[in-house]
Curated annotation (Swiss-Prot):
Annotated stretches, region: Disordered: 69-90, 149-193
Protein's name according to its UniProt entry: Eukaryotic translation initiation factor 3 subunit G
Superkingdom: Eukaryota
Family: Belongs to the eIF-3 subunit G family.
SMART domains found in the cross-reference section: RRM (SM00360)
Signal peptide from the UniProt entry: none
GO biological processes: formation of cytoplasmic translation initiation complex; translation reinitiation; translational termination
Entry keyword annotation includes RNA-binding: yes
Quaternary data: Component of the eukaryotic translation initiation factor 3 (eIF-3) complex.
Xref: InterPro entries: eIF3_g (IPR017334), eIF3g_N (IPR024675), eIF3G_RRM (IPR034240), Nucleotide-bd_a/b_plait_sf (IPR012677), RBD_domain_sf (IPR035979), RRM_dom (IPR000504)
Record's keyword terms, sorted: Cytoplasm, Initiation factor, Phosphoprotein, Protein biosynthesis, RNA-binding
Length: 279
């Protein structure tokens, strides 16, 4: 009884036939083999092979280094680098010369010309607001009125005057809260109430909002705001913070208890963020 075939590779070897190689007059050779496909049928495979010898010309020093004898653990290895022990890097062609400054200057000039070609020259100017669009498509045409279009100016204090102030000579839009009124005054937003805010200075750089809230000011009840002032570029603390309390009485109590106390190797200095008016 024949033994069971354990793998498909063994099954292929059982039906394999030695290859028939035919040398052709043109230097090629034809290899004919027989194999069994997935359906269990025996198929004939014909391959025409042409051997091409590629000769690469290298520098004599490179050829000399290839003939060096290997040593150490690679003493009995075959010629050439072994990918298991040698990491092959990318081939870099180094071109030496004295005109590298001229080449860099030319590259900079090409980049400058490319940037200049991308600049769009403004050829369209609106007669109403001066923007880079057609007058008929001006978004401020209805608000500025026909007087601006005809060369006149709206009367001060009118709705058209307020909208006209919203657009500068360059066509930039000015928000309403930043426009001057009829008297030339710029309205200001309501100032934030900092009457219960303390400025805490002389802090260590690693102190953050959570440390201030939990280690220093948690005993004084809920806090409205804790902000450590940081550098915009590095994000590192600048050594001071602002803490807002629920009432002025609680803030005064924290000022009296913590001012001049030590905290992480530094002496705290607490003061009101906004100067108090004398009574």
């Amino acid at each position: 009884m024949s033994s069971a075939i354990e793998s498909w590779a063994d099954a292929g070897d059982e039906f394999s036939v030695p290859a028939d190689i035919i040398q052709n007059p043109d230097g090629t050779k034809t290899v004919i083999t027989f194999r069994t496909n997935q359906d269990g049928k025996k198929v004939k495979i014909t391959q025409k092979i042409k051997e091409v010898i590629v000769r690469e010309k290298v520098h004599p020093l490179i050829a000399q280094r290839k003939n060096w004898a290997k040593y150490g653990k690679e003493k009995h290895s075959s010629p050439g680098p072994d990918t298991s022990t040698t990491q092959l890097g990318e081939k870099v062609d180094l071109k030496l010369g004295l005109s590298w400054k001229q080449v860099e200057k030319k590259e900079e000039e090409d980049k400058a010309q490319e940037r200049a070609s991308r600049v769009v020259v403004q050829t369209i100017k609106c007669r109403v607001c001066g923007g880079d669009h057609y007058t008929a498509k001006c978004p401020f045409k209805d608000t500025l009125g026909a007087s601006t279009l005809n060369g006149g100016t709206p009367e001060p204090g009118s709705e058209g005057a307020g909208d006209a102030d919203a657009v500068t000579s360059t066509g930039r839009y000015i928000p309403r809260h930043l426009r001057p009124d009829a008297n030339g005054n710029i309205p200001t937003r309501e100032a934030r109430d900092d009457s219960t805010t303390l400025k805490v200075s002389q802090l260590n750089t690693f102190v953050d909002e959570d440390m201030l809230r939990n280690e220093l000011f948690a005993r004084f009840g809920p806090l409205q705001r804790v902000t450590v002032v940081r550098d915009r570029e590095t994000g590192e603390s600048r050594g001071f913070a602002y803490v807002s309390f629920a009432t002025e009485e609680i803030a005064q109590k924290a000022l009296d208890l913590l001012n001049g106390k030590g905290y992480h190797s530094l002496i705290l200095h607490l003061e009101w963020s906004k100067k108090k008016k004398p009574l």
